[in-house]
């Protein structure tokens, strides 16, 4: 499963916001997020019954998620969830302090 999400923030601001998203996913769903470096994070866990195992990379105004395909029945739900979270956390109109962590 692949998701490519463009953003209008600086890479540093996007990184900071996605670190907050990682905290949210860990606190809310128990999804383990490990930052490999300033451009890559590994995700591992479950949302509902969907296994989320993949890598998120930041580069030149794009957040790219590459992960295990959960299968036909759950693919759209998993994609929608990840895209909606990226849209919410990478929205320049939303202050970082307003982004949920749990």
Question: At which residue positions do the language-model features occur?
Answer:
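Terminal, regulation- and interaction-focused segments at domain boundaries
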Residues: 1-31
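Preference for bulky hydrophobic residues occupying beta-strand positions
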Residues: 3-7, 43-45, 56, 67
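Ordered, soluble secondary-structure elements with a strong preference for glycine-centered loop motifs
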Residues: 8, 12-15, 68, 72-80
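Ser/Thr-rich, low-complexity intrinsically disordered terminal regions
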Residues: 20, 24-58
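Short, charged/polar low-complexity linear motifs in solvent-exposed/disordered segments
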Residues: 33-34, 60-62, 70, 82-84, ...
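Intrinsically disordered, low-complexity regulatory segments enriched in Ser/Thr/Pro
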Residues: 55-75
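A conserved amphipathic terminal alpha-helix motif
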Residues: 73-102
